[in-house]
């Protein structure tokens, strides 16, 4: 079987090509990966399905890739200097979304080259640019490719020029393929064999093993499956291995390659990508970016390490029925096995009961985590409005880090610092005005703008992260008819005039509705929430004031009118004084009720107030 040569390991590094695909959501990355799998015959025609590498339901449904996947493929180029030779390709499929930049950066570390995939009908997007710059920083060989050339709307001439300007190549070097029809894919694979350098190592074959972890997944039966890229030396089954950052020693139970399904093998040599299983049950034991080496006579220094991904956005997750709290805790633990960047801590709220304060990489990450909790674990959740990490200096000079409005210190504050991000927005030139206006209302400062081509503009702004996480992205899309693309990266912090707005029901604050907002927006937030709650909370037997306040100063108020029984119905005709007596009696009753009555906010009101157009 000539075709199965990729299943033998300890391949000569000269025959190996490690590459990944960088592309924006919907630019056809998974479809191209499907075609590549078919052409190299590693997937039987009958097993083939669309988006073969996207295993999670939510990935297939949203058409996005969340976890990096890797596949080892055999290929015999038909053209170029390596024609007729057996080349083993290792393709690592990366996520394209801004929140998962960390996943991308790890996948890039494991490769020598990258295919830059751009939709021939849309051109390059902001997030693809960010990932492209990451790849260039890692000195990867970039192969530019235009996909979807079979579309009637495709304009390959225009976009080849745009890509050529960005990465500094000739427009004719940009390859043209169609993942759907398979046109040009073989030429692309031949180009990969020709242009992407083979992995190199500075050490002899018998040097201590060093392998970098670029992903880890939790398998219910076998524990944690760790994906690694071998840099130096060899790893074989039944060896004792050590994780260099934690110093933990494990026994290698199984080592293998993924060719699209996991296959055991006799070990991995330099430059190869595969997986290992140690029977450990906790993903945090195999940290992404860590170095694996032999426990005995192992390597001295670790590879280029990774920083831990830091959560940027926080939100409280509460089960709708308190009985689900233990299930929510188990579900979060299981999710954390697969997603090391998710952080959580228990939190209690007077209004919502017990729940967790979770930290996410960004908004999409938050949405997907919530979706997965609801879908995979059947939980009904309320999530509070997202917030970010603030640094607060009190009057006495003490510092606090606050990411939950209920921890906001009372009394006077000397200064408050909020995180800021550098954003890159790519928009068609017709929408530059409205986009700039939107960024200014969100307290953005312009850093510069460039024309990528005559009708596409790149705008660079520094903005507070707190303004972006609410509804910035939705507003940006609606103002630009869906054509804008956004990328952001953190850029430190700045002094800001922020206040905490409390929502009071009958004079008592409801912690779930509190928010930290800029003083200029406090009035708007207060008005919006009081109006919304006035509609959502059912009328009581007595009048209920809904107020928004900063400290003790009320800035907005709405009244929920009392329900009144018609006490005069049984009073036919009769004297006015009789009617007045009944009305006075009713009034007294309402007054007494108002003093002792409490307002119960129905669950739906919480959900509606916190979820709709989170502004």
Curated annotation (Swiss-Prot):
<dbReference type="GO" id="GO:0043022">
    <property type="term" value="F:ribosome binding"/>
</dbReference>
<dbReference type="InterPro" id="IPR027417">
    <property type="entry name" value="P-loop_NTPase"/>
</dbReference>
<keyword id="KW-0547">Nucleotide-binding</keyword>
<keyword id="KW-0378">Hydrolase</keyword>
<dbReference type="InterPro" id="IPR000640">
    <property type="entry name" value="EFG_V-like"/>
</dbReference>
<dbReference type="Pfam" id="PF03144">
    <property type="entry name" value="GTP_EFTU_D2"/>
</dbReference>
<protein>
    <recommendedName>
        <fullName>Elongation factor 4</fullName>
        <ecNumber>3.6.5.n1</ecNumber>
    </recommendedName>
</protein>
<feature type="binding site">
    <location>
        <begin position="147"/>
        <end position="150"/>
    </location>
    <ligand>
        <name>GTP</name>
    </ligand>
</feature>
<keyword id="KW-0648">Protein biosynthesis</keyword>
<dbReference type="InterPro" id="IPR031157">
    <property type="entry name" value="G_TR_CS"/>
</dbReference>
<dbReference type="GO" id="GO:0003746">
    <property type="term" value="F:translation elongation factor activity"/>
</dbReference>
<dbReference type="InterPro" id="IPR038363">
    <property type="entry name" value="LepA_C_sf"/>
</dbReference>
<dbReference type="GO" id="GO:0005886">
    <property type="term" value="C:plasma membrane"/>
</dbReference>
<dbReference type="InterPro" id="IPR004161">
    <property type="entry name" value="EFTu-like_2"/>
</dbReference>
<dbReference type="GO" id="GO:0045727">
    <property type="term" value="P:positive regulation of translation"/>
</dbReference>
<comment type="function">
    <text>Required for accurate and efficient protein synthesis under certain stress conditions. May act as a fidelity factor of the translation reaction, by catalyzing a one-codon backward translocation of tRNAs on improperly translocated ribosomes. Back-translocation proceeds from a post-translocation (POST) complex to a pre-translocation (PRE) complex, thus giving elongation factor G a second chance to translocate the tRNAs correctly. Binds to ribosomes in a GTP-dependent manner.</text>
</comment>
<dbReference type="InterPro" id="IPR013842">
    <property type="entry name" value="LepA_CTD"/>
</dbReference>
<dbReference type="Pfam" id="PF00679">
    <property type="entry name" value="EFG_C"/>
</dbReference>
<keyword id="KW-0472">Membrane</keyword>
<comment type="similarity">
    <text>Belongs to the TRAFAC class translation factor GTPase superfamily. Classic translation factor GTPase family. LepA subfamily.</text>
</comment>
<dbReference type="InterPro" id="IPR035647">
    <property type="entry name" value="EFG_III/V"/>
</dbReference>
<dbReference type="InterPro" id="IPR009000">
    <property type="entry name" value="Transl_B-barrel_sf"/>
</dbReference>
<dbReference type="GO" id="GO:0005525">
    <property type="term" value="F:GTP binding"/>
</dbReference>
<dbReference type="InterPro" id="IPR006297">
    <property type="entry name" value="EF-4"/>
</dbReference>
<dbReference type="Pfam" id="PF00009">
    <property type="entry name" value="GTP_EFTU"/>
</dbReference>
<dbReference type="InterPro" id="IPR000795">
    <property type="entry name" value="T_Tr_GTP-bd_dom"/>
</dbReference>
<feature type="binding site">
    <location>
        <begin position="26"/>
        <end position="31"/>
    </location>
    <ligand>
        <name>GTP</name>
    </ligand>
</feature>
<dbReference type="InterPro" id="IPR005225">
    <property type="entry name" value="Small_GTP-bd"/>
</dbReference>
<feature type="domain" description="tr-type G">
    <location>
        <begin position="14"/>
        <end position="200"/>
    </location>
</feature>
<dbReference type="GO" id="GO:0003924">
    <property type="term" value="F:GTPase activity"/>
</dbReference>
<dbReference type="Pfam" id="PF06421">
    <property type="entry name" value="LepA_C"/>
</dbReference>
<keyword id="KW-1003">Cell membrane</keyword>
<keyword id="KW-0342">GTP-binding</keyword>
<dbReference type="InterPro" id="IPR035654">
    <property type="entry name" value="LepA_IV"/>
</dbReference>
């Amino acid at each position: 079987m000539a075709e199965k040569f990729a299943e033998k390991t300890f391949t000569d590094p000269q025959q190996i090509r490690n590459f990944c695909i960088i592309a924006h959501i919907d630019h056809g990355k998974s479809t191209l990966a499907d075609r590549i799998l078919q052409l190299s015959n590693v997937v039987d025609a009958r097993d083939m399905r669309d988006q073969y590498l996207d295993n999670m339901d939510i990935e297939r449904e949203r058409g996005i890739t969340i976890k990096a996947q890797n596949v080892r493929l055999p290929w015999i180029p038909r053209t170029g200097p390596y024609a007729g030779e057996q080349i083993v390709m290792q393709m690592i499929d990366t996520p394209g979304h801004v929140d998962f930049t960390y996943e991308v950066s790890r996948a890039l570390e494991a490769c020598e080259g990258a295919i830059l995939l751009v939709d021939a009908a849309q051109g390059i997007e902001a997030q693809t640019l960010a990932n492209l710059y990451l790849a260039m920083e890692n000195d990867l060989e970039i192969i530019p490719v235009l996909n979807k050339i079979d579309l009637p709307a495709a304009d390959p001439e225009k976009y080849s020029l745009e890509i050529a300007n960005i990465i500094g190549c000739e427009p004719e070097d940009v390859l043209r393929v169609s993942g759907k029809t398979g046109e040009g894919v073989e030429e692309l694979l031949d180009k990969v064999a020709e242009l992407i350098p083979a992995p190199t190592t500075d050490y002899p074959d018998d040097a201590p093993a060093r392998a970098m972890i670029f992903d880890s997944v939790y398998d219910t039966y076998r524990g944690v499956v760790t994906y690694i890229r071998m840099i130096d030396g060899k790893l074989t089954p039944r060896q004792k291995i050590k994780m260099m950052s934690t110093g933990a020693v494990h026994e290698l139970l199984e080592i293998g390659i993924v060719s699209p399904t996991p296959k055991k093998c006799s070990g991995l040599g330099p430059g190869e990508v595969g997986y290992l299983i140690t029977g450990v049950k906790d993903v945090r034991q195999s940290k992404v970016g860590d170095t694996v080496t032999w426990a005995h006579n192992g390597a001295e220094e670790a590879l280029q390490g990774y920083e831990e991904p830091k959560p940027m956005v926080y939100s409280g997750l509460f089960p709708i029925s308190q009985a689900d709290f233990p299930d929510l805790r188990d579900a979060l633990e299981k999710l954390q096995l697969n997603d090391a960047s998710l952080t959580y801590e228990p939190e209690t709220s007077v209004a919502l009961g017990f729940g967790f304060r979770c930290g996410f990489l960004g908004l999409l990450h938050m949405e997907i985590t919530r979706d997965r909790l609801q879908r995979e674990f059947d939980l009904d959740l309320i999530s509070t409005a997202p917030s970010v990490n603030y640094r607060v200096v009190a009057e006495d000079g003490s510092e606090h880090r606050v990411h939950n409005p209920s921890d906001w210190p009372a009394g006077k504050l000397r200064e408050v610092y909020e995180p800021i991000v550098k954003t890159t927005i790519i928009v068609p030139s017709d929408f530059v005005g409205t986009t700039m206006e939107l960024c200014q209302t969100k307290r953005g400062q312009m850093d510069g703008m460039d024309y990528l081509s005559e009708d596409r503009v790149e705008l660079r702004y520094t903005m507070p992260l707190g303004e972006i996480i609410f509804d910035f992205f939705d507003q940006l899309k609606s103002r630009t008819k869906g054509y804008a693309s956004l990328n952001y990266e953190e850029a430190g912090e700045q002094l800001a005039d922020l206040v905490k707005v409390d929502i009071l029901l009958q004079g008592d604050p409801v912690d779930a509705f509190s928010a930290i907002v800029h003083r200029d927006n406090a009035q708007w937030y207060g008005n919006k929430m009081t109006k919304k709650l006035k509609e959502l909370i059912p009328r009581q037997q007595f009048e209920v004031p809904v107020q928004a306040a900063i400290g003790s100063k009320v800035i907005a108020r709405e009244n929920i009118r009392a329900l009144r029984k018609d006490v005069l119905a049984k009073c036919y005709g009769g004297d006015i004084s009789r009617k007045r007596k009944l009305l006075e009696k009713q009034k007294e009753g309402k007054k007494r009720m108002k003093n002792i009555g409490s307002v119960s906010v129905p669950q739906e009101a919480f959900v509606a107030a916190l979820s709709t157009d989170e502004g």
